[in-house]
């Protein structure tokens, strides 16, 4: 966020905020300071809240999982979106 944006009170879009949060989570996880996947329930709640602004979904419609294999980590998000 630039100083001008801060002074004018411009707000970040939810997509950029979500991207920043995911980057922080991944960086934190890679540094080894966190227990494995302790943030997933909070991440799932936040994703449901953001997606619910645009599409009607419930907690059961979104699943978040983290898989580890050797030195590779995969964050998987599955969303069931109802048909219109």
Swiss-Prot record:
InterPro entries: MinE, MinE_sf. The keyword Cell cycle applies. Keywords: Cell cycle, Cell division. SUPFAM superfamilies: Cell division protein MinE topological specificity domain (SSF55229). GO terms for biological process: cell division; regulation of division septum assembly. Belongs to the MinE family. Prevents the cell division inhibition by proteins MinC and MinD at internal division sites while permitting inhibition at polar sites. This ensures cell division at the proper site by restricting the formation of a division septum at the midpoint of the long axis of the cell. This is Cell division topological specificity factor.
């Amino acid at each position: 966020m630039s100083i001008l944006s801060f002074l004018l009170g411009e707000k970040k879009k939810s997509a950029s905020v979500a991207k920043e949060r995911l980057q922080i989570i991944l960086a934190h996880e890679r540094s080894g300071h966190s227990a494995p996947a302790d943030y997933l329930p909070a991440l799932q709640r936040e994703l449901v809240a953001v997606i619910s602004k645009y599409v009607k979904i419930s907690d059961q419609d979104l699943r978040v999982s983290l898989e580890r294999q050797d030195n590779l980590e995969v964050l998987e998000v599955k969303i069931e979106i109802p048909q219109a």
